[in-house]
Amino acid sequence: MTVGKSSKMLQHIDYRMRCILQDGRIFIGTFKAFDKHMNLILCDCDEFRKIKPKNSKQAEREEKRVLGLVLLRGENLVSMTVEGPPPKDTGIARVPLAGAAGGPGIGRAAGRGIPAGVPMPQAPAGLAGPVRGVGGPSQQVMTPQGRGTVAAAAAAATASIAGAPTQYPPGRAGPPPPMGRGAPPPGMMGPPPGMRPPMGPPMGIPPGRGTPMGMPPPGMRPPPPGMRGPPPPGMRPPRP
């Protein structure tokens, strides 16, 4: 139900009210709520009822009962009167705690982090890592070496197959000279393409002086007197 602010019922909220019912009972309690049917809610309510004596000689006595929170039906309500003003403390009753007296301490909110004046704890020697940005490995050390090595080896193999000159790092000697029958000395022409070079000592190198001409090799007997020895290397024997 819509109730205006100027309603008399709203003006008596939290007052101590005396409610009289049709059967003569009286309810005294703190008025808290109501509705359009005049159903009431009373808290801290006490019930008072009059008991008639059996004999006419005895006086009528009144009985009191403590009920607490009560819901009264509006159809049984006869009248409502103000019993007293609202109590001073309408909140929840507080129970005093032992030792709750104020002390010398100061209440403050719990802070986050470490205060500025407290020194930072340090790790034991040997367990502390390098400072960020200082003492770490260089970029060259962290670069993977596998790719560069494989690429260099592949380039060297390709250059050797194609016949391109291989570049050697500074401080190292070049390739060793060719052994055996290599290129002819300067000023002389080599054999034409497709022909094998002639047998015998390399061109430009005199024959060995260890064995004179006409002497048999070591381990062979010389020919008997009057017979010619074998022809020198590179010459055909005479026809008979």
From Swiss-Prot:
Sorted UniProt keywords: Cytoplasm, Methylation, mRNA processing, mRNA splicing, Nucleus, Repeat, Ribonucleoprotein, RNA-binding, Spliceosome
Organism domain of life: Eukaryota
SMART domains: Sm (SM00651)
InterPro entries: LSM_dom_sf, Sm, Sm_dom_euk/arc, snRNP-assoc_SmB/SmN
Compartment(s): Cytoplasm, Cytosol; Nucleus
Region (Repeat-rich region): 175-236
PTM comment, free text: Methylated by PRMT5. Arg-108 and Arg-112 are dimethylated, probably to asymmetric dimethylarginine.
Pro residues bias: start-end ranges: 172-205, 214-240
Residues found modified as Omega-N-methylarginine: 108, 112, 147, 172
Keyword RNA-binding belongs to the record: yes
Residue span, Sm domain: 4-86
PROSITE patterns: SM (PS52002)
A GO MF label: RNA binding
Keyword check for Nucleotide-binding: no
Residue(s) carrying Asymmetric dimethylarginine: 108, 112
Region (Disordered): 163-240
Gene Ontology biological-process annotations: mRNA splicing, via spliceosome; spliceosomal snRNP assembly
General function of this protein: Plays a role in pre-mRNA splicing as a core component of the spliceosomal U1, U2, U4 and U5 small nuclear ribonucleoproteins (snRNPs), the building blocks of the spliceosome. Component of both the pre-catalytic spliceosome B complex and activated spliceosome C complexes. As a component of the minor spliceosome, involved in the splicing of U12-type introns in pre-mRNAs. As part of the U7 snRNP it is involved in histone pre-mRNA 3'-end processing.
PANTHER family per UniProt: SNRPN UPSTREAM READING FRAME PROTEIN, SNURF, SNRPN UPSTREAM READING FRAME PROTEIN-RELATED
Quaternary structure note: Core component of the spliceosomal U1, U2, U4 and U5 small nuclear ribonucleoproteins (snRNPs), the building blocks of the spliceosome. Most spliceosomal snRNPs contain a common set of Sm proteins, SNRPB, SNRPD1, SNRPD2, SNRPD3, SNRPE, SNRPF and SNRPG that assemble in a heptameric protein ring on the Sm site of the small nuclear RNA to form the core snRNP. Component of the U1 snRNP. The U1 snRNP is composed of the U1 snRNA and the 7 core Sm proteins SNRPB, SNRPD1, SNRPD2, SNRPD3, SNRPE, SNRPF and SNRPG, and at least three U1 snRNP-specific proteins SNRNP70/U1-70K, SNRPA/U1-A and SNRPC/U1-C.
UniProt name for this protein: Small nuclear ribonucleoprotein-associated protein B'
Source organism of this protein record: Bos taurus
